[in-house]
Amino acid sequence: MSTVTITDLARENVRNLTPYQSARRLGGNGDVWLNANEYPTAVEFQLTQQTLNRYPECQPKVVIENYAQYAGVKPEQVLVSRGADEGIELLIRAFCEQGKDAILYCPPTYGMYSVSAETIGVECRTVPTLDNWQLDLQGISDKLDGVKVVYVCSPNNPTGQLINPQDFRTLLELTRGKAIVVADEAYIEFCPQASLAGWLAEYPHLAILRTLSKAFALAGLRCGFTLANEEVINLLMKVIAPYPLSTPVADIAAQALSPQGIVAMRERVAQIITEREYLIAALKEIPCVEQVFDSETNYILARFKASSAVFKSLWDQGIILRDQNKQPSLSGCLRITVGTREESQCVIDALRAEQV
């Protein structure tokens, strides 16, 4: 008689799943953490809600209204969730039939699109970006049959560049009546002029992902948003958990989205952009750096000579970067979060000391 293990009882797609390798899961013992695109210092908040004996609202009214005002959309076009990652998953759960439909994304890009789909049992299709990391629209068009959700990250993680807005329009026309197009704008606060939020009236099948983890300096809060037309939001509300945001999370999110909170966020963005330009200029002068790519975000992608050795050398010194070497078209590339001036200097000094 054969023995059935617990693993044997699991779904086949889960047994075969490679989980997303988050910065924390990868570990490391560092003093300089530049691998997760977090804001380098903590922002202080005081809790004002003490009703922890009661369940929270599913969609806290103040949070929704504050975010709608900030994003320039209607409150009924906003859904709040446990980070933008939950929004990625909700869109698949609401629109994709297991074993029938597919999602499509364009590597190199954020890894949670594929993990979310594979966990649910939905097919993943990929159309790698062109050499300039813009969309291969012909390639996408050729693979759209059966695709229900298309994910496009702009600015793209990990490459840092914006997707051409005309290409977005072409994609939205290609998919009209066929699929939802999801613009992942996790880093849009660093280039707000490029947001597609103003396009919702034109495109009923457009959804936009946002987060408080980056420019709002609240990665530990786990609070994200989906912006979409009311019909899409209503469908997502059918599949979201009954209490996605705890009372303390909603409390802090509402404060972060107050007029004072928005001003503070924009000051942080200006500071990070100044620091980013300083770090880019310094990296371009370092012998072990082959190429530094332009960035519209709070991180920089660079190609290195002997990138694996450089990554390990800095890791051993307690400077933790993100290795992108295995991503399509990113051979030799490391991603560096823009931190404080002191952290930038640690990276610069360590890289200058590398023997090429």
Swiss-Prot record:
Annotated metabolic or biological route of this protein: Amino-acid biosynthesis; L-histidine biosynthesis; L-histidine from 5-phospho-alpha-D-ribose 1-diphosphate: step 7/9
Enzyme Commission number: 2.6.1.9
Transferase in keyword set: yes
Keywords: Amino-acid biosynthesis, Aminotransferase, Histidine biosynthesis, Pyridoxal phosphate, Transferase
Annotated S-S bridges: none
Known cofactor(s): pyridoxal 5'-phosphate
Coiled-coil segments: none
GO MF term set: histidinol-phosphate transaminase activity; pyridoxal phosphate binding
Catalytic activity entry: L-histidinol phosphate + 2-oxoglutarate = 3-(imidazol-4-yl)-2-oxopropyl phosphate + L-glutamate
Pfam families in alphabetical order: Aminotran_1_2
Matching CDD domains: AAT_like
Top EC category: transferase
PANTHER family linked: HISTIDINOL-PHOSPHATE AMINOTRANSFERASE, HISTIDINOL-PHOSPHATE AMINOTRANSFERASE-RELATED
UniProt subunit comment: Homodimer.
Family from the record: Belongs to the class-II pyridoxal-phosphate-dependent aminotransferase family. Histidinol-phosphate aminotransferase subfamily.
The protein, known as: Histidinol-phosphate aminotransferase
Source species of the chain: Escherichia coli O1:K1 / APEC
Underlying gene: hisC
